Amino acid sequence: MSSASVVEAVSVNSAIPQNRNYEYVLEVANVRKEFPGVVALDNVSLRIRPGTVHALMGENGAGKSTLMKIIAGIYQPDKGQVLLRGEPVRLEKPLDAQEAGIAMIHQELLLMNPMTVAENIWIRREPKGRFGLIDHDEMRRRTQELFDRLNINLDPEAEISELSVASRQMVEIAKAVSFNSDVLIMDEPTSAITETEVAHLFDIIRDLRAKGIGIVYITHKMNELFEIADEFSVFRDGQYIGTHLSSNVTRDDIIRMMVGREVSQMFPKEEVALGDVVLSVKNLSREGVFRNVSFDVRAGEIVGFAGLVGSGRSNVAEALFGVAPADGGAIQINGEFVQIKSPNEAIQHGMAFLTEDRKETGCFLPLTIQENIQSAVLHQNFVKKGFVAEAELAKEAVEICNKLRVKTPGMDEVIENLSGGNQQKVLIGRWLLTHPKILILDEPTRGIDVGAKAEIHSLITQLAHKGVAVVMISSELPEILGMSDRVVVMHEGRVTGILDRAEADQVKIMDLAAQ
């Protein structure tokens, strides 16, 4: 289809029931949401028709999840409004959304243990019998009635802990229907279930659609969009791009809408003379997580890893660093086979690993900058005859902080008090102190401001000039394209392609990432 036809307005779906006095069951009008230093949503609008499946598409960080959390009452918009059945509503908490008829099934399912299926569905709404006691027989009867309506084959008295991910999703759907919801939001519902389970889920979604429920379906998988969605909307960089009928577009049209921007000039890539292969990975696998992952990284080379949420990129990084070791395949460093079963072994082999979640698995928040920086080297360069060379360590830590331009009153400042960008610089400084041969960076600029991003990109380039082999995982395609010599693309635990810098572009990467 032509680019001109991509922007055509969506016509009314003739299959939608017409016995209502409103056209849209849910509307979001001119919503803006800001977080410190970030505009997550910029004047966004969205309309959901009753009796349709409406998919939301966009790169990671496009604003989809933020918008859904506003609709579900988790966040409140700074500007704009939400309308339900044509009337403005104020959703100050998730319970407000539930009572208004909006239910959300999160990617991380929120069912409670140790409780039964029925107890989870009717929590805080349990039917009461004589003397105000919970009527368990009635609760079971209501649950079974729900399951019969939805064609769900589960025991209402089963413990949640005994259920598969797919079965737990069915419980979440039944719970949503029990609120008589008019709107059901589903966030990546097929990310952890089998093809057979997906088929069953789609049957239930079609049944809910036939009952007039408006379903908002967040997905990265284009085949699902064409199979289950009536229409879809695309978001990019916190902005609404457009809404279209699924039957009117091609896969290439959608990719073009999702990635329609040029790489920013803040990602300059300097040419570096590449050396020998430092890291060689062959058929690396971990059962149920990733399989047969192979790639090489040369001295001075930056190899970017691209892929959608759940593609397995971070799992590969954790395996390389011994956080969650692989159970198959081989790793070579400078031509020698190595076994890495722990982070300490990885550090001894010259590896460094910047994790994707600096607050949870990176920073030691109650400790000082000095203590955070020195934490990786206490058993490395600065230990001599059982004693830590404290003066030498402190001196180099200060030099690194100055080099990275960490904004802080002093080395004794608690890292929790720093901005996200400065925390990230400290974590990079921690690994620079180990003088690594291999640097693995997982989302190195996530959640930091533009200025700090540029400084970190410059630092990565400097390390490449010094011969460090860099593996960089990023969900930002401009960052991947702007910084990488080669791009490894993953999808559902496997490598779907490796692109040289000259041939890589956003459309090719998204095509490989969505296979």
Curated annotation (Swiss-Prot):
It is found in: Cell inner membrane. The keyword Heme does not apply. Keywords: ATP-binding, Cell inner membrane, Cell membrane, Membrane, Nucleotide-binding, Repeat, Sugar transport, Translocase, Transport. SMART domains: AAA. ATP binds at G58, E59, N60, G61, A62, G63, K64, S65. The keyword Translocase applies. It is an enzyme of class 7 (translocase). One of its GO terms (cellular component) is plasma membrane. Its main location: membrane. Its EC number is 7.5.2.11, 7.5.2.7. Residues 26-262, 272-511 form the ABC transporter domain. It holds the Pfam family ABC_tran. CDD domains: ABC_Carb_Monos_I (cd03216), ABC_Carb_Monos_II (cd03215). GO terms for molecular function: ABC-type D-ribose transporter activity; ATP binding; ATP hydrolysis activity. It is a peripheral membrane protein. It catalyses: D-ribose(out) + ATP + H2O = D-ribose(in) + ADP + phosphate + H(+); D-galactose(out) + ATP + H2O = D-galactose(in) + ADP + phosphate + H(+). Coiled coil: none annotated. Part of an ABC transporter complex involved in carbohydrate import. Could be involved in ribose, galactose and/or methyl galactoside import. Responsible for energy coupling to the transport system. Belongs to the ABC transporter superfamily. Carbohydrate importer 2 (CUT2) (TC 3.A.1.2) family. This is Putative ribose/galactose/methyl galactoside import ATP-binding protein. It comes from Hahella chejuensis (strain KCTC 2396).
